[in-house]
Amino acid sequence: MSNQLLDRVVAEIADEMAQRADRGEVASYIPELARVDPKAFGLAVIGADGHIAAAGDADVPFSIQSISKVFTLTLALGKAGDRLWRRVGREPSGSAFNSIVQLEHERGIPRNPFINAGAIAVTDLILSGHQPREALGEILRFMQFLAGDSSIAIDEAVAKSEQRTGFRNAALANYMKSFGVLDNPVEYTLGVYFHHCAIAMSCRQLAMAGRFLAHNGQNPSTGLNVVSSERARRINALMLTCGHYDGSGEFAYRVGLPGKSGVGGGILAVAPGRASIAVWAPGLDAAGNSHLGRVALEGLTKRMGWSIFGV
């Protein structure tokens, strides 16, 4: 892969996105997110050799929201291994990210770890045996370690905004608690959940944190194995099939990469063996995924030939 080509493609995509009028709608149900500039756009791509191509607002921190679920899943699998799958499934939901419908049909077991109910169950596992502050500290330190940046922090204003308005998440958690899926007090689990979703990172930091998923579980910056190659492959598989809620099929069809979105407008995408990619554009589509983020990634994979399904 030519670094000059990558630099040019990333710059071209950023210029193209700046001209787009169809930007989607900024999330309004979390008051703090509603204040974000809808014209923001950032893109960062880190190649296998460590070269970084970045453009636009790639160094502006944003609320990663559900992208944090990739990293909490990684932590939970490290703690519990396959025992995790007793409390959460691995199937696409086909429903909105905060839907309670399937929980009713499936006796409190969430479909996958990337919908809200599934991520709450994963958070509960990480919390077990710890105080909420300890569990949250572990998650934050893990993110800082992966990104190689100790300045990464939680946006307390966003976390408090989510706590004040997170009634559906409270309903999901209480419903799972009634089936014994959650071990800890609901308010503790939700507190940790809201706070790790409120971690703020830039595209550059997020792409750095995701590099282990592009390189068989190894962090190329340190040479350390974060997870086994098998586990990295399986996390990527879940990102491909479940990472964009009920828009996961559309994302796979158009982009052709494992990816995880967040309602803050970010997307972390993985080109296995090639690159870790983070894009941010706050305007969302009807499924709650970044509209221009998806468009930008589609352009990137086409021009670089990175779709896992072929050029």
From Swiss-Prot:
It holds the Pfam family Glutaminase. GO terms for biological process: glutamate biosynthetic process; glutamine catabolic process. Its EC number is 3.5.1.2. This is Glutaminase. It is an enzyme of class 3 (hydrolase). Signal peptide: none annotated. Belongs to the glutaminase family. Homotetramer. The gene is glsA. It comes from Rhodopseudomonas palustris (strain ATCC BAA-98 / CGA009). One of its GO terms (molecular function) is glutaminase activity. SUPFAM superfamilies: beta-lactamase/transpeptidase-like (SSF56601).
